[in-house]
Every structure is written in structure tokens, then in C-alpha cells.
């Protein structure tokens, strides 16, 4: 999906200097493998978390999970819409990591997806759950489809009181994983100039 390419692109920028990452509600998604420069990678899920030689899986309920540490970066992708107690869940993300990136389905109609308990979700609802405004947000829509479930909102939260510059993050972003399908053109690289122009610090 185009959405996952966008996630990979943003993590390469926003987590370029991260040494630890936790993916909350990982399911069995393998995208965490692409963040090769992050030494400590944990994938947490209430059942069957993703795991590999490079990624430690943690089977736990996030609301009762005790991290025992602060991660540099937390991901929570397409999870909150499934969680009845979305507000305490979202707020806890900021207690386990310095930087947080969240994605949610954007304005999907109720009943479109079984298991979603909060649709439709938009930036106002996400702001209510997290109690804060994102430092960067973007709505990513899948191309070549008119499905009502084609769009997702991605929001990034930088630590309060620390300098935040999209320009610097764009300059310092990590290269794509060397062994990740070298014959596949990275379409998002072509959008980098547009992205930077549209989001100048």
C-alpha cells in the first residue's frame, strides 16, 4: 500500500537518530524490519506480536504494560480505532516514548470495517484522544481507487520544548534499507521536494 511507503519515509526522517523503537499494536506487520539503523526494536501486541532475529516481540495488553524504560520512538499505526478506551491508550504512548507517530483511518464511514469502534475519525478526535496537537500531520490516500476506506491520517508528535525543524529532518533522513527491492523506484523520493516546500519550518 502507498500508505506504508509514506510511513517508512516519515520514520526515516523523524526517527533518523533513534536507537530504540516500540511498535504498539504491531500485529504481524513486517515494516519494522525496514528501520535497520535502530538497534533496539520491540513489537507489542495483545496476541501474536511480530518478531524476528532483529525484532523482539512482546505479547501484552498495552494499558497494563510496564515498559521499564523510555523509547526514543513509538509507532501506533491503525490501532486506536479498535480500542474502546482510546484516550488513556493514546495518552500512555507519550509516557513510553519521547517521539510518537500515530495513524488512524481518516473519515471512514461507520460500519465500513468490522472491529472499528470510533469511525469516523478525524484530526479533532485524535486531538481529543492525545490531548495535544501534532507537530506534523498528513492525510495519505491510496491512488487509483474511490473506496471510502482509502485515506489514513498520520500524525507525528515531537518532544515538548525541543527544536523541531522539518527542513533539518528532511536533510538528515536515513537512506532506504539497502536490500529492500532495489529495482523498485521509491515514488516518495520524487515527492520529497513538494513535501519540504509545503511544510517549511
Show where each model-derived region lies.
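A short beta-strand submotif of the Rossmann-like class I SAM-dependent methyltransferase core
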Residues: 73-79
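Conserved beta-strand signature within the Rossmann-like core of class I S-adenosyl-L-methionine
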Residues: 97-109
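Flexible loop residues that form catalytic
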Residues: 46, 79, 105
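Active-site segment flanking the S-adenosylmethionine/decSAM binding pocket
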Residues: 84-89, 105
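Short, charged/polar micro-motifs that form catalytic or ligand-binding hotspots
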Residues: 79-83, 116
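Helix-to-beta-strand junctions that scaffold the AdoMet/dcAdoMet cofactor pocket
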Residues: 83-84, 97
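Conserved N-terminal segment of class I S-adenosyl-L-methionine
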Residues: 1-73, 87-90, 95, 114-200
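A short, structure-level motif marking secondary-structure boundaries and short turns
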Residues: 75, 109-111
Amino acid at each position: 500500500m502507498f500508505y506504508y511507503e509514506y510511513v517508512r519515509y516519515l520514520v526515516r526522517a523523524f526517527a533518523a537518530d533513534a536507537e530504540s523503537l516500540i511498535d504498539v499494536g504491531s500485529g504481524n506487520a513486517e515494516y519494522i524490519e525496514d528501520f535497520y539503523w535502530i538497534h533496539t526494536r520491540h513489537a507489542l501486541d495483545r496476541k501474536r506480536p511480530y518478531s524476528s532475529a532483529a525484532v523482539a516481540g512482546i505479547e501484552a495488553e498495552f494499558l497494563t504494560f510496564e515498559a521499564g524504560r523510555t523509547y526514543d520512538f513509538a509507532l501506533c499505526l491503525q490501532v486506536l480505532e479498535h480500542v474502546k478506551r482510546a484516550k488513556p491508550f493514546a495518552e500512555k504512548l507519550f509516557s513510553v516514548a519521547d517521539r510518537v507517530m500515530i495513524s488512524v483511518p481518516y473519515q471512514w464511514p461507520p460500519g465500513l470495517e468490522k472491529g472499528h469502534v470510533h469511525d469516523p475519525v478525524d484530526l479533532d478526535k485524535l486531538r481529543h484522544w492525545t490531548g495535544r496537537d501534532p507537530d506534523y500531520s498528513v492525510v495519505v490516500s491510496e491512488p487509483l481507487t474511490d473506496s471510502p476506506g482509502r485515506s489514513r491520517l498520520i500524525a507525528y508528535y515531537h518532544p515538548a520544548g525541543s527544536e523541531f525543524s522539518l527542513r533539518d529532518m528532511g536533510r538528515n533522513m536515513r537512506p532506504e534499507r539497502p536490500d529492500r527491492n532495489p529495482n523498485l523506484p521509491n515514488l516518495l523520493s520524487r515527492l520529497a521536494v513538494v513535501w519540504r516546500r509545503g511544510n517549511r519550518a
